């Protein structure tokens, strides 16, 4: 592509008028820049079936014009681009800012093979075919598109993906499950982390909180779909493994095998690093393996996730504590990632906590259970202190170990508990007794704990929002117990790494962006840096650490991690969808009991059918799901999802505005039912049904695919109508409707076609003869307005209309298909690039000409000219002629600039 920044002329818009202007100016030797907002040049003419009155093929006329424009040596075309501003004047020239949207496909590499389109998992309405059929998010707009290059529709990031702190492409794997591509879905999640099964069970699913469908019947079951993916993959006799890359000769040690450490190791190993994980516990897996109970996350699931890591060549060493990072350096490791989590339980610092037996830290209590050394709580009374996730897990685990009663005491009132509401509900359903709004005054007992002393908590945080509980010391109570379990927080093991955690700090200190510590070759990630978070957040931190380590070892700037597009607006998504079929979410059907007896997993797995149905509820908010199937399918490696919009600054001497018209939105006439009744279509949609490249193999009605036998046209829909603010005749609606009548007679010889009209206006060479020809072919014409359209149960439509020639009676008629001959409106974008009010519009909103008779094409801004339907409703021949006038004006302007005075 020409990368020049100076041109003779700018043509805004590439419809028939814009292309004509560009070609003619180019033929004169002027260098022309054409800016088109759509992915292809061609405008609206390429949508047509044939042109009137000759019934020549519209594509056969427009495609040579498109090719001549695109391949003209003096013409440069920018598609998917918008002129943001035009500044300057005719004497000094114009400075133009162009915003070029990202295509997400390298046009220089793309061969137009459409394999990306075949692989794409997201179907969206096809604008080229009037949204009567679907296309893919990765697509070429239409068969004759120029450039014949693919693009990916990405208005933004889907809320579920944007809301995932792990960085998993949630929308992507949902769309893959919907398409039956389960292994590809597993691979997509594994691009982020090896903990597919773990996250499928133990993640708190912020993606579901963000899901747009949540504002309708309820969110898509995104987390359960991830579990389905993992279960399906692990059930294979020989699941495919990630191919080991060639070693790059460098080694990294990862201290800690929790979600952050495992993810960092996984990402580094995928980049060819030799990785060793060093874990102080007797088993790898961190909190998922040692803290989360089996009824939520079975140990075998975590262990199977660990196989993903070791299959990639990562070495895991357990039962080994690291206290000297320099020793790792001496062992030949080029970098170290510290991801030791928060293994230190917080203390209450009250009487009896240290001196009485039977007072346990929740982390130790849960760890003993996971390592096969549970306490026998049969018949005992247990008090769990805390209101978070760990406290809930401890309380529910105590019930499963036979406790006669389990009391849960927390500072917060129930609504303010850190634990999720559903966790609290499930705990209460299992018989846990909640005492909210109480603090701990101390423990009582002789040698072993016998009671917990309580004091009323009046507030948990101070006025600044800091954790600083206040108590009513006079309001006391107590609970007798045999065992007390303290779950009031966790902290990092800072004592092991004094250089990374100076005195007085509670977590390891890193640069918040790069995660690099004070020791350049040491990075830290996960809860050891952030304090207690979720598994997904720790995974995201581990990914970031691996990215930064990789860049540091390659001598690159520590930047460039996860730069997603902005999240799409949910209101726009719902508006884009139009109507929604109600699709209820699946009930989790968790197996709860007042006295649970074992640690068997509670949540059932989704079946194949349920997974398809659940994924089918997705609204495809971001259109492109980032499933990466196009990346895998493209033989030219042309897909680049990292592309971003660009702004270009160019200078021109003349501007031609050829932005065309807007079609009247038929839903502004609600009495006609367009958008509600599937068998009410617009004239543009009928053009597509009649075109050689039509969406169906014949003319069918969209509602049920039947061949229509009775077809009605409603003329002047949105034209000559003060109720919608358009008193003008749209000039060519009558003629395109007559053209379609004749084509319908050819395609459906037995069809009856009736035209409900106000007046037939056929002013042009051969136009009246065209009207008479349609009448002779059998079209029925009924003079009078249509009052409204209603739909019958079978999809047929009843028109209520006046019949002026029949005495002015109000009548009704039934049709299989109704076509609204929509009119045209001015394009409001025509004046946007110019300073407010600089480009004068006429009273209807079209670009005003100084004198359309004596000075056609000239606008209120010297050096800026208008061509075609941007200045008023025009058919194709008129647009071409008017474009010629604008070209003559622009050429004269360029000549004046070339030869001053």
Predicted features along the sequence, with ranges:
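Non-heme iron-sulfur electron-transfer modules
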Residues: 38-64, 78-109, 121-159, 168-194, ...
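FAD-site-proximal beta/loop scaffold in flavoenzymes
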Residues: 122, 126-148, 355-380, 462-532, ...
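Beta1-alpha1 glycine-rich phosphate/pyrophosphate-binding loop at the start
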Residues: 7-71, 134-140, 159, 165-179, ...
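A Rossmann-like FAD-binding core segment of flavoenzymes
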Residues: 64-106, 298-351, 360-378, 400-505, ...
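Phosphate-coordination loops involved in phosphoryl transfer and adenosine-cofactor binding
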Residues: 6-8, 80, 107, 248-251, ...
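Short cysteine clusters
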Residues: 110-116, 120, 160, 164-167, ...
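A conserved FAD-binding loop/helix module that cradles the flavin
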Residues: 528-556, 656, 724-736, 867-897
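A short, basic/flexible loop-to-alpha-helix module at the beginning of a structural domain
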Residues: 1-7, 148-152, 233-252, 364-379, ...
């Amino acid at each position: 592509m020409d990368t020049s920044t100076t041109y003779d002329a700018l043509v805004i818009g590439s419809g028939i008028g814009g292309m004509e202007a560009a070609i003619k100016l180019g033929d004169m030797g002027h260098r022309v820049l054409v800016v088109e907002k759509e992915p292809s040049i061609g405008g609206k003419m390429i949508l047509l079936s044939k042109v009137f009155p000759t019934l020549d093929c519209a594509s056969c006329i427009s495609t040579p014009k498109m090719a001549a424009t695109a391949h003209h040596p003096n013409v440069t075309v920018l598609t998917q681009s918008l002129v943001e501003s035009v500044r300057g004047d005719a004497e000094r020239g114009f400075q133009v800012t162009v915003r070029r949207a990202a295509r997400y496909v390298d046009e220089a590499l793309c061969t137009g093979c459409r394999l990306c389109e075949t692989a794409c998992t997201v179907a969206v309405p096809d604008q080229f075919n009037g949204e009567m059929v679907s296309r893919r998010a990765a697509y070429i707009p239409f068969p004759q598109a120029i450039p014949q290059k693919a693009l990916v529709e990405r208005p933004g990031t889907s809320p579920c993906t944007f809301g995932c702190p792990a960085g998993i492409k949630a929308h992507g794997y949902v769309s893959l499950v919907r398409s039956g591509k389960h292994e590809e879905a597993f691979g997509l999640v594994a691009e982020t982390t090896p903990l597919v099964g773990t996250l499928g069970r133990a993640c708190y699913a912020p993606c579901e909180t963000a899901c747009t469908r949540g504002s309708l019947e309820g969110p898509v079951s995104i987390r359960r779909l991830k579990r389905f993916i993992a279960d399906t993959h692990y059930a294979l006799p020989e699941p495919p493994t990630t191919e080991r890359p060639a070693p790059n000769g460098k080694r990294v040690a990862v201290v800690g095998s929790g979600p952050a450490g495992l993810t960092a190791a996984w990402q580094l190993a995928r980049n060819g690093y030799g990785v060793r994980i060093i874990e102080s516990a007797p088993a790898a897996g961190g909190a998922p393996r040692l803290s989360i109970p089996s009824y939520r996350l079975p140990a075998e699931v975590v262990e199977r996730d660990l196989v993903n890591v070791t299959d990639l060549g990562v070495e895991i060493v357990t039962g080994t504590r690291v206290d000297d990072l320099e020793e790792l350096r001496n062992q030949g490791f080029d970098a170290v990632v510290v991801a030791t989590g928060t293994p230190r339980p917080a203390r209450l610092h009250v009487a009896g906590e240290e001196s009485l037996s039977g007072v346990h830290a929740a982390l130790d209590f849960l760890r003993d259970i996971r390592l096969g050394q549970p306490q026998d709580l049969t018949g005992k009374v247990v008090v769990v202190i805390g209101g978070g996730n760990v406290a809930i897990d401890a309380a529910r685990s105590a019930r499963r170990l036979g406790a006669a009663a389990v009391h849960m005491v927390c500072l917060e009132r129930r609504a303010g508990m850190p634990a999720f509401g559903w966790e609290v509900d499930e705990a209460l359903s299992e018989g846990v007794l909640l005492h909210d709004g109480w603090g701990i005054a101390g423990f009582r007992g002789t040698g072993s704990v016998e009671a917990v002393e309580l004091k009323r908590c009046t507030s948990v945080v101070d006025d600044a929002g800091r954790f600083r509980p206040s108590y009513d010391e006079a309001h006391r109570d107590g609970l007798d117990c045999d065992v007390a379990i303290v779950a009031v927080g966790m902290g990092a093991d800072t004592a092991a790494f004094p250089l990374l955690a100076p005195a007085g700090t509670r977590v390891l200190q890193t640069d918040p962006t790069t995660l690099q510590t004070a020791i350049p070759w040491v990075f830290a990630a996960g809860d050891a840096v952030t304090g207690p978070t979720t598994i997904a957040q720790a995974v995201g931190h581990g990914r970031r650490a691996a990215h930064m380590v990789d860049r540091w070892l390659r001598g690159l700037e520590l930047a460039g991690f996860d730069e997603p597009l902005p999240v799409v607006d949910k209101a726009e998504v719902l508006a884009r969808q139009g109507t929604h079929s109600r699709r209820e979410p699946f009930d989790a059907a968790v197996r709860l009991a007042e006295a649970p007896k074992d640690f068997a997993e509670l949540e059932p797995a989704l079946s194949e059918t349920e997974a398809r149905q659940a994924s089918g509820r997705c609204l495809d908010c971001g259109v492109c799901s980032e499933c990466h199937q196009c990346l895998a399918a493209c033989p030219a490696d042309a897909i680049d999802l990292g592309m971003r919009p660009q702004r270009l600054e160019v200078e021109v001497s003349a501007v031609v505005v050829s932005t065309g018209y807007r079609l009247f939105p038929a839903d502004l006439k609600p009495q006609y039912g367009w958008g509600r009744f599937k068998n009410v279509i617009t004239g543009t949609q009928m053009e597509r049904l009649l075109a050689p490249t039509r969406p169906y193999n014949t003319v069918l009605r969209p509602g049920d695919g039947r061949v229509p036998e009775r077809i009605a046209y409603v003329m002047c829909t949105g034209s000559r109508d003060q109720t919608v603010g358009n008193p003008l005749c749209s000039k060519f609606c009558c003629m395109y409707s007559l053209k379609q009548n004749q084509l319908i007679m050819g395609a459906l010889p037995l069809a009856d076609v009736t035209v409900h009209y106000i007046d037939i206006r056929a002013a042009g060479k051969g136009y009246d003869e065209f009207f008479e020809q349609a009448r002779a072919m059998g079209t029925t014409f009924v003079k009078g307005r249509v009052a409204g359209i209603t739909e019958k149960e079978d999809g047929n439509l009843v028109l209520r209309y006046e019949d002026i020639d029949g005495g002015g009676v109000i009548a009704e008629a039934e049709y299989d298909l109704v076509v609204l001959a929509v009119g045209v409106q001015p394009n409001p974008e025509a004046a946007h690039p110019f300073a407010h009010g600089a480009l004068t519009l006429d009273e209807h909103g079209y670009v005003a000409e100084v004198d359309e008779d004596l000075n056609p094409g000239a606008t209120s801004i010297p050096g800026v000219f208008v061509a075609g339907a941007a200045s008023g409703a025009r058919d194709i021949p008129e647009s071409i002629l008017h474009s010629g006038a604008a070209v003559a004006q622009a050429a004269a302007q360029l000549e004046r600039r070339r030869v001053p005075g």
